[in-house]
Amino acid sequence: MVETTNKGYVCQIIGPVLDIEFPGGKLPPIYSAIKIETADGIGNIVEVQQLLGDNKVRAVSMRSTDGLKRGVEAVDLGAPITVPVGVPTLGRIFNVIGEPVDEQGDVVVDQTLPIHRDAPAFTELETKPSIFETGIKVVDLLAPYRRGGKIGLFGGAGVGKTVLIMELINNIAKAHGGVSVFGGVGERTREGNDLYEEMKESGVINSSNFAESKVALVYGQMNEPPGARMRVGLTALTMAEYFRDVNKQDVLLFIDNIFRFTQAGSEVSALLGRMPSAVGYQPTLATEMGALQERITSTTQGSITSIQAVYVPADDLTDPAPATTFAHLDATTVLSRNLAAKGIYPAVDPLDSTSTMLQPGIVSEVHYETAETVKETLQRYKELQDIIAILGIDELSEEDRLVVARARKVERFLSQPFFVAEIFTGSPGKYVSLEETIKGFTMILNGELDDLPEQSFYLVGNIDEAIAKAETLK
């Protein structure tokens, strides 16, 4: 029998970074996983980052290195970190190395995959841009998502990010027969727990039968070492790739927060002895970001559409971390505190949200024209708000008063009841097709509904519901 176990020992520990010495000629390659025995018997997984010479490798730990000593045995596992994939992962919470952490027992899977994989080859890519319909009016009309694209989600605390994420998970499952993977990267443990509980409440996770759940969760939270936060995005992505490539499904991949991925890389970079670049970030920033983002794409088999929450440090959009992220995004969804304060949910800002898909040739002509007219109407209303606040609406010209009346109807019609919010609002959720959305806004802008009260457009699905609601308000 061939001896497969390659053993070394820890010779230096610098925070989350360890140096390990192996016998001559038996160095594990870069990205290999190495298991280190710990006093609690659980063991610590570290990932090789550099080959130093003198039979030593430098590795980054996925768990806390507290209590580790020099001289402890390290076993080369002979492969990169591998994680479970497939239907058994749905409804469960995993850590960076694919261990379930929700106290619901072991996960039995037929297959595990390494977290470091090549992006799909050019020949496998789906090149024709197509819209990914979400059933959410404001998104589909004004900042449509690309199938297999990357969307940046911007918004402060309490403006409805979590509810929007859960609605998207719900809609992809119902309308596209797809699944979702949620990667919690370096965010608060409390938020991760709240999200899990809310998903169980809203039916996105079915705790009595996990196979009927619509999402798998992977968490590497703030309290974990930078190695875990740096790799947890790849763990989530690997699970999503399996659903795309093997199950041939449309997948939604959520990364909350993409900035923490970069931040973890910069924490490790200095300890690995790399020279820092601008603002102290790692010199490999663009490469690391590209390696993650290039794997998120549409193939001829299925698609991974990614929605990434983007934290902007000190609101500086020129900071290297958000600036590098923007280079990869196809669309942005900006949540507005002003709209949330008015009670308009989803609080997506119709003027600040953008999409590269909203151009003639990709969307239909009527879609493009309707979206542009909606934006013009809302922009004009925004410009007139100061005058209205000072002089009152009666001082406006007849034409401007009509614009304001229609803009207020448009603003309210951009709101929508969500399936996952039924338990809070008491009103049933609505999925609105793109066709219905365009029809509704065209009717408002053409003046066909000028005689209806603006309340009738608030929190309804399609335009027929608004007309029916107006009847009940009479």
From Swiss-Prot:
It comes from the Eukaryota. It is a peripheral membrane protein. Its EC number is 7.1.2.2. It holds the Pfam family ATP-synt_VA_C. It is an enzyme of class 7 (translocase). Produces ATP from ADP in the presence of a proton gradient across the membrane. The catalytic sites are hosted primarily by the beta subunits. This is ATP synthase subunit beta, chloroplastic. It comes from Thalassiosira pseudonana (Marine diatom). The lineage of its organism: Eukaryota, Sar, Stramenopiles, Ochrophyta, Bacillariophyta.
